[in-house]
Amino acid sequence: MSALCLRKVDPLLAKVSRELGAGQCLSFSAKGQQAELTLLPLIASDETPAKGVWLNTAVGALCLSDAEALLSLLGDIPLTLGGEQQAWYWQFFNQRLSPTIADLLAPVEPLPQACAELTVGCRIQVRLADQQVHAHLHATPETLLTLLRSAAWQARLKPLDERWSISTPLILGELSLTLEQLASLRPGDVLLPANCKFDSAGQGFLTLAGRQWAAQTDSQDQHLLLRLSHEEHSHHEY
């Protein structure tokens, strides 16, 4: 069997990918309506160089495609990028941003030149009432990481494909038998393990993926459930 070759990933890019996960959502309000800003990973066909309008923000330089439409949904006034850009206009625009967005990005202002550093991208979506804008955002890895850590983002939970399953034995206890004892066993025989992993109440421990899990069995609608927990106090049911 040949060795599995894995591509090398820059540690900073790995942090960004882990922080972004399946996507992050930020709720805000604008124009008296509830809205949502969402960042999503790029899909393979979207991996193109940064194109759009470069903006300087509180978290760093960002490049937005369809910036005019997207920024217009982040506050109470529409944004126009046509004509000569004046400082008073951007000051007014920042004052009318949603407070949540202003805390994250303000002050927002155009950058005269594109960022020359290596950038990474993600998809960005804004939904305000029945309006939606889908665009792309590019920034340096450091800036994107700062963006993801500078607000109360909520992780999007992507449902796991039911076709992907992992089978592992559930060990209830351990005991040693000689070959003669094993050969003498008959259906209906009762075995008492010398080392029990579970008690009569269904509580016990399970070793899975090199970690020790506290386990609790339960039944619901004639299905046996196994609840696992570990030191991070998260729970998983199977």
From Swiss-Prot:
Residues 66-238 are annotated as: HrcQa-C. It is found in: Cell inner membrane. It comes from the Bacteria. The keyword Cell membrane applies. GO terms for cellular component: plasma membrane. It is a peripheral membrane protein. Keywords: Cell inner membrane, Cell membrane, Membrane, Virulence. Its main location: membrane. Component of the type III secretion system, which is required for effector protein delivery, parasitism, and pathogenicity. Probably participates in the formation of a C-ring-like assembly along with hrcQb. Interacts with hrcQb. The HrcQa-C domain interacts with the hrcQb C-terminal domain. This is Type III secretion protein hrcQa. It comes from Pseudomonas syringae pv. tomato (strain ATCC BAA-871 / DC3000).
